[in-house]
Amino acid sequence: RNLGLNEAQGKYINFLDSDDYISSNTFRDVYNFFEKHYSEIDVVSIPIYYFGSQKGNHPLNFKFKKTGVADLSKQPEFIQLSGPSSFFKAEAIGDIKFNVKLQTAEDAFFVNQLLLNKLKLGLVKSGSYFYRKFEAKNSLLDYSSKTKGYYISRIKQFHFKLIYCSKKKYGEVLKFIQYVLMYDLQWLFKIKKIDHILSHDEIHELYINLIFILQNIDDDVIYNQKNIQNQLKTHIFFLKYLGNDYLANCDYKYRKQVYEEIIDKLSLNQVFIDIFEIQNDVIYVSGFITTFFNKKGNVFVFVNDKIFETKELEYPQRDRFSLNFEYAFNNDFELYIPITSKNIKIQFKTEVNDFKDLEIKFTRPCRLSNTSKYLLSKNHIAKVKGSTITVKPK
C-alpha cells in the first residue's frame, strides 16, 4: 500500500482488497460527494456488507442512516476502522504511511491519523463495499491473533501511538479516538486463553498496557459498547479502576465498591433460565447466575414466599476467562417445584446481592423468553414479568 501511495496520481485513493468488490455506483457517488464537500472532509466511508460464508451488515453500518458529513466531536461513536471501505483525498495524506510494524490495525491507524486533522467523516449511504467471509478461519486476523505481535506490537504501534497522536494534537484523547480504541480492544478481551502464545512475563506486560489504555477511555465509552456482554464490561471496569490489585485478587471490599457503582447500569442483578417446564403438576427450572467475587453463589428460589434450595450443577464450558484471567463464575442450578396451589409466584434471590430480587432473563433453549412471555402446558399457563414468574391454571 505504501508503494501504491508513492505511485498514485489520482485525486482520490481507495485500497480495495483482492477478495472483495465494490458496487458499480460507488465510485460515482463517492466522487460527487467529495466534490461537493471537498473543503470539509479528507475521508469518505461507505457501508460494508458480508458475502461468502457469512452474509449481513458490518456492526458499524449503523452510522449510515443517511448520506452526509459526520462531526466526530459531536458523534464520536461514528468510528471508521476499515481502510478498504474508505476513500481518501490524495492531497490530505501527505507524509502519512501505513505502519509496516502492524500486521493488523494498520488500516485503523492510517484512517484515524487523517480523521484527527478535520474531525469530520463523509458518509455515503448509497455506496457498498462487499467483504468476503471465508468458511475456514484462515484470514490474516485469525492467524495474527495466534502470534505474539497481536498482543505486544499491536498495542504499542496502534493503541499507544493513536493515544499519542491525539494528545499531541489536542492535549487529550478525543472521544472518537476512545471509541476506536475500545471497539478494537473488545476482540482482545474476548480471547480466553493466551498462555500458549505469551510467557508469564509477557502476559503481565500486556495487562499493564491494557490498564494504561483503559485509563484513557471514559466510562460512558465502555458502557456504550454494543458488542461486549455486561459481564465482560464488569471485568473491564475492574481492570480500569483497580489495576494490578484486581489481578492479584484484591480485597473483596474494594471490588465491591466498583461493582456497586456499575451494577444497575449494567443490569447485573440477573438470573438466566435455561429450562422452564411444567409436567405432571411439577415445575422444573434450570439456570445460572454470574458472580464476580467468589466461585460459590447460592441461588434461592422463593415460591409464594417459601424458600426452596437449589441443586448445584457444573458446566465447565461456561467458565468466563479473558486473556487467561478468570473474571467471573457461573453458578448453575436446578430445582423441582411441586404445584400445590392455584396461583404460584416464583422469584430468585442470592446472598451475593444481599437477597435482592434477581431480574429474570432467558437463554436461547428456554421456551419462555423476554419477548415470548407466556408458556402453556396441559393444565397451566406461566407468565414472566421483571423478577417474577407466575403460574396459574388455564
Language model: regions and residue ranges:
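Non-catalytic N-terminal targeting/anchoring module and adjacent flexible stem/linker
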Residues: 32, 171-172, 176-394
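Nucleotide-sugar donor-binding/catalytic module of glycosyltransferases
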Residues: 1-160
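Catalytic core of nucleotide-sugar-dependent glycosyltransferases
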Residues: 131-135, 141-171, 193-220
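Noncatalytic linker/hinge segments flanking ATPase motor cores
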Residues: 81, 86, 164-172, 226-228
